[in-house]
């Protein structure tokens, strides 16, 4: 019995000590790992099979899209020492995201600033997050030094810190929006009338946009959603403009007071 326990213990140590071979940085991971990578980054080009200008997802076997439409270049590699995987979205603006290679998890949120369910995942700060937090740190340090140098009262110092904290809180929504300077081009310019082939996609999200309705004799019917009830012309219909960046889509309701909604161009889901 002791010998058996010793063998099991030794075998366990060997398993734990075994390192996964390093996967070189590549744009084409092994086929055996496609299911893993495409769970996290379904918009990467290696997740799609394109023929005659039409692409089909290799894993989900659905979501037919035009060739090179909403597909971005990604690079992946595995670090055997840290037992973590990492992928990069484009070489011009890499987005590093570490995850446990043996425990893939489904994700939520957009792909540039990915957030995963559960613990154990480490999300790297984006460039603008790092810059903002760096500026915040300098501002707090400056307030503290200023309070010491000018020998300000505690009450005045607390007011300064509260004011600065309010400004930081107001700046938080900026972190969830992409900066246009990080993108080199736009695939689809902002427009009020998307192509006919994309109506099903856009009207899944912006079902109240005016381009989603076919109006005759003052009565309108939704072009995509058959279960939507008929409405009076221009009733509950708002103007929407749409745009697509290299890796994401967004639509705006009312240009003057925009309601911005980001989405994954290659994987539309119902907007709630």
From Swiss-Prot:
InterPro entries reported in the protein's UniProt record: ASFV_fam_110
Subcellular location as annotated: Host membrane
Transmembrane spans: 1-17, 129-149, 156-176
Glycosylation sites (chain numbering): 68, 264
Pfam families registered for this protein in UniProt: v110
Membrane topology: Multi-pass membrane protein
Key words of the record: Glycoprotein, Host membrane, Membrane, Transmembrane, Transmembrane helix
Domain of life of the native organism: Viruses
GO CC terms in record: host cell membrane; membrane
Entry's family note: Belongs to the asfivirus MGF 110 family.
Role summary: Plays a role in virus cell tropism, and may be required for efficient virus replication in macrophages.
Protein name: Protein MGF 110-11L
């Amino acid at each position: 019995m002791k010998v058996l326990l010793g063998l099991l213990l030794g075998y366990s140590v060997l398993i734990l000590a075994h390192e996964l071979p390093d996967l070189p940085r590549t744009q084409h991971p092994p086929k055996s790992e496609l299911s893993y990578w495409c769970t996290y980054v379904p918009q990467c080009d290696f997740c799609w099979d394109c023929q005659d200008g039409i692409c089909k997802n290799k894993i989900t076997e659905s979501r037919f899209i035009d060739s090179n439409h909403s597909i971005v270049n990604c690079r992946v590699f595995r670090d055997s020492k840290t037992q973590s995987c990492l992928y990069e979205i484009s070489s011009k603006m890499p987005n590093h995201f570490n995850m446990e290679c043996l425990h893939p998890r489904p994700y939520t949120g957009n792909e540039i600033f990915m957030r995963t369910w559960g613990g154990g995942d480490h999300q790297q700060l984006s460039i603008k997050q790092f810059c903002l937090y760096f500026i915040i740190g300098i501002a707090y340090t400056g307030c503290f030094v200023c309070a010491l140098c000018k020998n300000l009262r505690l009450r005045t110092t607390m007011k300064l810190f509260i004011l600065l904290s309010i400004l930081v809180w107001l700046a938080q929504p900026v972190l969830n929006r992409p900066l246009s300077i990080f993108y080199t081009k736009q695939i689809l310019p902002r427009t009020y009338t998307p192509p006919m082939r994309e109506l099903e996609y856009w009207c899944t999200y912006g079902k109240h946009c005016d381009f989603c309705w076919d109006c005759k004799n003052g009565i309108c019917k939704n072009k995509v959603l058959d279960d939507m009830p008929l409405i009076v012309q221009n009733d509950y219909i708002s103007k929407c403009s749409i745009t697509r960046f290299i890796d994401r889509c967004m639509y705006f309701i009312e240009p003057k007071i925009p309601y911005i909604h980001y989405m994954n161009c290659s994987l539309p889901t119902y907007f709630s």
